[in-house]
């Protein structure tokens, strides 16, 4: 008689992690299971903390809206959305920082590629750890004026920028290749119909500037679209 015993390791994560230090609201979080640390964005700053809320390091100097994020265990990299824009949200961030407001024509949107291994102290300048990939497709839709039912409207598709970020396989295939997905923010406005879709851009991991797919998911009117998203391997 052969008896085989196996043990399952259960990790108990805290129900609450109390974290302070940002001037604005927390927007995105990502968990590093191997290092037992949490990455979080406080809109204009990025924090690295342990699971008890003790801050290990931070990244500052961001005059923009650092939003949702995802963590790639293989490359030790956080990918986050970054908006630099002129709307109510953009003005609020600049005002809170005492910084100059952005002009509409200068509004830009980026995927921030963050090397978390370099965050080893407080107030690391963002230029030392972040590589920014400009997403022209989002900027174009944000700046465009369209005619809907004979009325000229700002922001094509109701695009307010971008927020949700996730790493996942391609839709409809069994390939193991991973892609980075970024979701548009969508202004809520029930008087128009071109904003009844949530929009996802799909990027190859080695080319975060040029989307390979642009998906339109009809959901009806939403307020700011997809704020956060993740991939469920079990579904």
Regions found by a protein language model. Give the residues of each.
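Beta-strand-rich domains and repeat architectures in extracellular enzymes and scaffolds
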Residues: 14-44, 163, 169-172
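Residue-level detector of Asp-centered blade-edge/turn motifs that repeat once per structural unit
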Residues: 31-35, 71-75, 169-176, 231-234
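Surface-exposed loop and turn segments in beta-propeller and other repeat-based domains
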Residues: 14-19, 117-162, 204-224
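Beta-propeller domains
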Residues: 32-62, 207-208
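Hydrophobic, aromatic-enriched interface-forming segments
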Residues: 151-217
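Repeated scaffold domains used in trafficking and secretory/extracellular systems
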Residues: 23-30, 63-72, 137-145, 157-170, ...
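Blade-loop segments of beta-propeller domains
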Residues: 52-99
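Beta-propeller blade signature
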Residues: 93-121, 193-208
């Amino acid at each position: 008689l052969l008896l085989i015993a196996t043990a399952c390791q259960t990790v108990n994560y805290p129900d609450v992690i109390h974290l302070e230090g940002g001037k604005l609201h927390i927007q995105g979080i990502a968990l590093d299971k191997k290092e037992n640390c949490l990455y979080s964005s406080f809109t204009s700053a990025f924090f690295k903390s342990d699971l008890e809320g003790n801050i290990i390091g931070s990244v500052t100097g961001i005059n923009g809206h650092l939003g949702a994020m995802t963590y790639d265990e293989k490359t030790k990299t956080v990918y986050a959305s970054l908006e630099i824009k002129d709307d109510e949200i953009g003005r609020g961030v600049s005002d809170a920082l005492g910084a100059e407001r952005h002009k509409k024509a200068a509004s830009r949107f980026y995927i921030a590629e963050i090397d978390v291994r370099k965050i080893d102290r407080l107030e690391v300048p963002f230029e030392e750890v972040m590589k920014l990939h400009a997403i022209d497709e989002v900027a174009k839709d944000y700046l465009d004026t369209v005619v809907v039912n004979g009325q000229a409207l700002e922001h094509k598709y109701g695009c307010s920028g971008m927020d949700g970020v996730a790493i996942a396989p391609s839709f409809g295939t069994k390939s193991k290749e991973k892609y980075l997905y970024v979701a548009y923010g969508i202004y809520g406005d029930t008087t128009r119909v071109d904003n009844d879709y949530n929009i996802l851009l799909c990027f190859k991991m080695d080319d975060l500037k040029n989307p390979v797919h642009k998906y339109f998911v009809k959901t009806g009117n939403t307020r700011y679209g997809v704020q956060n998203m993740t991939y469920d391997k079990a579904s």
